Amino acid sequence: MILGLGHVDLVCGDLERSLAFYAAVFGPLGLQDPALFEGERGEQIHYLRFPAPGSGSLGLRQALERQEFELYAPGFHHLALTVDRRDDVDVAHVAAVAAGAEVLHPPRAWPEYHPQYYATFFLDPDGFRIEVSAARDARLV
C-alpha cells in the first residue's frame, strides 16, 4: 500500500538562490531547515522538510549546467503545496512577491477545481510553477 509521496527533488540553476527563495516564501509557514545528503554526483542535496508529520520533503540540488525550464516538455509540470488556511495562501503570496517571484495568479477562489479551493500560483527562480492552495476536505485527483 502506498502511504504518500516521500520527497520531490528539484534541480536548480543556482542552488543558493533557490534555498534563499524557498526559505523566504515557506519559512513563515513552517518549512524546516534542510537535512543534507550527498547525491550520486557527490553534490549536496538540501531536503527542506514540511512540518506536518509524514508530509515529506522538497529536495533542492545544483544543476550541472543552466538550462531554461520548459513547462510542457517531458518531465515536471508544477509543484502544488497544501496549507491549512486561506490566510496561509495569502502569506505565501506576499512572501513570494517580496522574494521577487513572478506571480501567475494572485490568491483567489477556484470553484472550478472545488467549491472551497483557494490558491495562488507563482514561479520560483528557475521558472518552476508553484501552486499554494487551501481547500478544506478537497481532494483533487
Task: Identify the role of each PLM range.
Residues 1-19, 79, 136-141:
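N-terminal beta-strand motif that seeds the catalytic metal site of vicinal oxygen chelate
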Residues 2-4, 72-76, 114:
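Short glycine-enriched loop/turn motifs at secondary-structure junctions
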Residues 9-56:
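Core segments of cupin and vicinal oxygen chelate
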Residues 12-17, 79-125:
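Vicinal oxygen chelate
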Residues 43-84, 91:
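Long, continuous compositionally biased terminal/linker segments
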Residues 57, 131-132:
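Short glycine-/small-residue motifs
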Residues 128:
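Conserved Rossmann-like nucleotide-cofactor binding loop
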